[in-house]
Amino acid sequence: MAVSMREVDAVFQGAGQKDGLEIWRIEKLQAVPVPKESHGRFFTGDSYVILKTTALKNGSFRHDIHYWLGKDTSQDEAGTAAIKTVELDAALGGRAVQYREVQGNETERFLSYFKPCIIPEEGGIASGFRHTEINEREHVTRLFVCRGKHTVHVKEVPFARSSLNHDDIFILDTKSKIFQFNGSNSSIQERAKALEVVQYLKDSNHEGKCDVGSVEDGKLMADADAGEFWGLFGGFAPLPRKTFSDLNGKDSAFSSKLICLNKGQTVPVDFDVLTRELLDSTKCYLLDCGSEIYVWMGRETPLEERKRAGSAAEELLREVNRPKSHIVRLMEGFETVIFRSKFSKWPKKADAVVSDESRGKVAALLKRQGFNVKGLAKAAPVKEEPQPQIDCTGNLQVWRVNGTEKTFLSFSEQCKFYSGDCYIFQYSYPGEEGEECLIGTWFGKKSVQDEKTTAISVASKMVESLKFQAVMVRLYEGKEPAEFFSIFQNLVIFKGGVSTGYKKFVSENGIEDDTYSENGVALFRVQGSGPENMQAIQVDTAATSLNSSYCYVLHDGDTLFTWIGNLSSSMDQELAERQLDVIKPNLQSRMLKEGSEYDQFWKLLGVKSEYPSQKIAKDQESDPHLFSCTFSKGVLKVREIFNFTQDDLMTEDVFILDCHSCVFVWVGQRVDTKMRAQALSVGEKFLELDILMENSSQETPVYVITEGSEPQFFTRFFTWDSAKSAMHGNSFERRLSIVKDGVKPKLDKPKRRPTTSSSHTGRSSVPEKSQRSRSMSFSPDRVRVRGRSPAFNALAANFENPNARNLSTPPPAIRKPSPKSPSSDPTKPPQRAASIAAISASFERPRPTLIPKSIKASPDVNKPQVEASKPKPEANGKDSTPSKDSPTVTPTIQEDLKEGQPENEEGLPVYPYERLRTSSINPVTDIDVTKRETYLSAAEFRERFGMTKEAFAKLPKWKQNRLKIALQLF
């Protein structure tokens, strides 16, 4: 039900429009804004409304509203705060989650807004207390108790020995010194977090200038700080063993109760199993879980009904005498994960992408019919491709798993994967602190379980041999992150497999082996973001495998087609041309535009049928969530840390950072060996539990990262200081050194990163990364000759300089001198180089075109293409073919070769450019639409393309297509 803004306090208009905090204090039953400089300062006699607005990656805002009640606040102010919270939610569109916060028992989410803590001050508006400024009052010795491993709850207690106990941590703030007393039963992590409160008191109460002392429970007068501390209490005396904590754990035995609110009346709802179907959109409900009460408000309920529901929850707490229980109010459709987890069945949220899918289908349909869909296609929101966060100039080594062994792949084979196999890769690259290393496993969709187990075991041993200073990642085909594709740059994934495990599995189960064959029929989908991030993936040889948003390569023996989808980009088309050099380097491809296919093309695909037009959806990176973990006997328990920072990563613990598209398991240096070995299992168990109820895939990438070896694609989620993860000691010792000395301790940085170990490779070196980059990517200015002989390709590969290095990598510390011939003269170019130049020049002569330009493309492709066009003589009668001694000139877009030579007319009619354009309002009919440029006159061709037709013909096919696309002739 729509809510009128007349029912909402005007002070809330415009709230929640930017990331950050907004706070209002209740003064005379009205909400009054609190200035930003006073945020985090609360008074025990007041009530507040706090709005936390978070900007999400999808461009929207998430709103969390809290109303905080001081222990001395009046009942009227508390009630007003609750009502104003409902009004603020209405002003925000009814999407916020609302929390009731009681002084001393605040939620961890609320406390995370005011790190490291909040310490309410005496005073209040209604009570008449005077708000004294810090610099107006004299220092009074105060004692605080601190509880919490990840978020600190601070409470002031009487300054007396009887307040101390063995379970908690206490901070004594005196005029000249701050003491931290660590109870013997407190953890290292709790002590480290309490030190953040010490730092806060030092900065706020002492202007950062006072001594800090640490006192360990059980240490007597021998310690100077301990002696001084106990002296303030009148001397040392034993503390009682058992103490009662007013922050006891939640009652796990409490049986949940569901109560329906109908016209001001409360009606219990009986149920055997709590399901979503019990909730009606026209009503409000209370779900009493003991330590918290949830108020669920149906979308169709009026504002007054929602206010009454909040009051009913407050009344329920008074009746059952649970004043410290939390109240969480939620609107239908915006329920929290914790609330949904209370139900045995909760429907999954559907992704709202129907409009984009429909738009793509309509655009593809119209384009097939010859309409210009440029505007329609652009109307769809473009999802940015994730950018790789890794240096791509490193050294790569790859192994294929064969049964229980691994087989090293040569440089030419390391980027050719099979879907039935498992692979292990090791990638060393320059990082911010030195060389970094990534060791990963890749599982094909049809790989066998035994080889997956072997891959994980071998990769784990490789990481262990490098003293856990390498990052480990487990990947599945189809779920690879951007970093993986950037490392491999030009990846081809074939069907089937060649490993012993796959072959054995196929044989034993009587399954047809569909392993790729060069002479068979195969269809590849080409994808990627650029020449150094492109993939060709073999798909089923069927029309249903096509997609209007991609380009495809289809071959059957010596027949080769390139299919261009109507919604594909010019970059997609360029990548398809480049992939031909990998899949079929010695064949000439026939380019087919969607809607202009040959009959033979459809015959190879079986039968013509419908196919999709929308790009294949990828898991999008969402806003990260950090969880602390405990894992024992196969049981994983997690606790979310809100508004996290690097300081939340404790060296004694294991944490999970969930970004939806991938999961990072961070392992502290002081984690025990057993837990460290189970890190990958922790990540897999986390995915299995689906903690955030996002329908996470078990094949989501899982990274295992050891403290001190954090890569940039992990640290980008934090404001990162690499020095912190390289500090001495445990969490408490590190923080104490900073608090006491005011500076960071001396660092002991490990040598990052270990060089490639020959024990895993069977060789002592790997190809230089510059060599790797050259062989896996192509310069856009390089003219590549399609169909040149394998002999020339091999010769060119052998003569590439393997010693040329990318400048981003330092040269080896020691370089052995190469042996020189006694007769060599360093001042003269070697004869070998001259010989290579001569041989290369002879190989680079322009090859005759396979299809004569005078013949139009015909659907009948079964006729042998044996006729070749002969070189035309120049005007002076000389043959235009260069001699062996003449250098080969490579034409570029701006060059105009042989300007004085008459144009080679092809016997075709000449039409003006405006009628040949694909978007022409008066298009020419009965022409070969794949060669629109050939119908231009020589003069207009030169005007439009900036070169002659001969120069254009000598360009690589992909460059020709790019020019034609730019001129709307493609």
Curated annotation (Swiss-Prot):
Repeat (Gelsolin-like) residue spans along the chain: 31-111, 151-219, 273-339, 416-484, 536-576, 643-714
Protein name: Villin-3
Source organism per UniProt: Oryza sativa subsp. japonica
Keywords assigned: Actin capping, Actin-binding, Calcium, Cytoplasm, Cytoskeleton, Repeat
Residue segments, region Disordered: 741-908
GO (cellular component) term, any one: actin filament bundle
Biased composition (Low complexity): 833-842
Stated role: Ca(2+)-regulated actin-binding protein. Binds actin microfilaments (MFs). Involved in actin filament bundling, severing and capping. Caps the barbed end of actin filaments and is able to sever them in a calcium-dependent manner. MF severing is promoted by VLN1.
InterPro entries according to UniProt: ADF-H/Gelsolin-like_dom_sf, Gelsolin-like_dom, Gelsolin-like_dom_sf, Villin/Gelsolin, Villin_headpiece, Villin_headpiece_dom_sf
